[in-house]
Amino acid sequence: MRLFYFLVLFLTAFSAKASFVLLPMDETSQQNHLKAYGITFWCLDKQYKASWLLNYRGGSFLLPDAPEIRKECQIRGVSFEVLSDAEANQILEEIASPSQNMETVILEKAPKIAVYTPKGKQPWDDAVTLVLTYAEIPFTPIYDEEVLSDGLLLYDWLHLHHEDFTGQYGKFYANYKNTPWYIEQKKDAETLATKLGYAKVAEEKLAVAKKIRDFVIGGGFMFAMCSATDSFDIALAAEGIDICEPMFDGDASEANYQSKIDYSQSFAFKDYFLERNPNVYEFSDIDMTQKRANIPMEKDYFTLMEFSAKWDPIPSMLCQNHTQLVKGFMGQTTAFDRELVKTNVLVMGECQLNGEARYIHGEKGKGMFTFFGGHDPEDFRHQVGDPPTVLDLHPTSPGYRLILNNVLFPAARKKKQKT
């Protein structure tokens, strides 16, 4: 109850009128869930305090009432409700009740966001860049030069998407080796590696992966999707081992390299086998894409786990949504073989048809990481060269909401997980 009374005092300090703006996040009341995150970020950036009401109407946001906040909601098409002091207190009292699986989390400051992305145009979209732009949440693109010069120290949150940290150029060789974009990307990567003082792209990418690892250990938050998940772990575990075939680095791979993989260096995965064939569009058996061929598109959904908001606020924040059942989507790394997920990594979303892990979270040092399988939550089978998803057509996307949960998560006042 002491927490409840503190929150009441905290909220009454917002304005003399003691009224508040609620951004409802349930399925029927909010017309643009994605931009609601942007409004909340905008408020934090302007030094307003905000509260995230976990499991209350889909994970709603409580903001101070100010004319500029109402105006911004109207401009961006975000549904909001104006509450009196008494109404806000009643909601907080309901949330504070021990019988309710709800919690109030105070958001204190807008996190500084970096997106790891190359300077040139890629022949595929990046779901996180798309949704950050759509939600009007500012971010800074960074790449290898910035990472290797300790540029990550300037940020709280780092996103990685369709990346390959193993030096195998995304395993695109079989289908795209003669295409102009593949040839150009390979040349650019080699030029950059040489410029930065590395003999091979794989060595340079490993150095980048290690800087990202150190960023997390030091307290940073890393969010990765698609092939940035498993290729990152593989690169760390294969340090000092040549796993690249001649078409990638000019010489043969190391004999018996599988037996030399050090799984203890990986963040999330264990006991996996690497895919040696350069013509197979796969890094290892971590990915479920080829193992799940019997799951048709119309049945491809994953279920978000339910956590105790009061006792486990971290996974609760990361799983806030207006539905527990989220539409699946493919990627180079679609989902993770649950048998290969380390026991200290939390599975937050799984496909109940085959038990695969889709959405996982863990701690490393003082920091945290979240891995999310798949490429684009609103494009079931996004292909190379496909146009970017138009998010105006998907303003209430549950899959994109999961990405934005991760964006706002570093803004939360830290409270240690109790279980």
Model-found features: residue ranges?
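Helical hinge/lid and interdomain linker segments adjacent to catalytic or ligand-binding clefts
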Residues: 21-31, 61-62, 67-71, 121-229, ...
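Serine-dependent carboxylesterase/thioesterase catalytic core
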Residues: 206, 214-217, 229, 233-275, ...
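Alpha-helical scaffolding within the catalytic cores
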Residues: 96-101, 145-147, 354-358
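Extracellular ligand-binding/catalytic regions of CAZymes and related secreted enzymes
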Residues: 19-25, 31-62, 242, 341-419
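Catalytic beta-strand/loop cores that center a nucleophilic Ser/Cys/Thr
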Residues: 126, 131-133, 230, 260-384
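Hydrophobic targeting/anchoring helices
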Residues: 18-126, 135, 374
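N-terminal signal peptide c-region/cleavage motif recognized by signal peptidases
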Residues: 13-15
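Sec-dependent signal peptide recognition
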Residues: 1-9
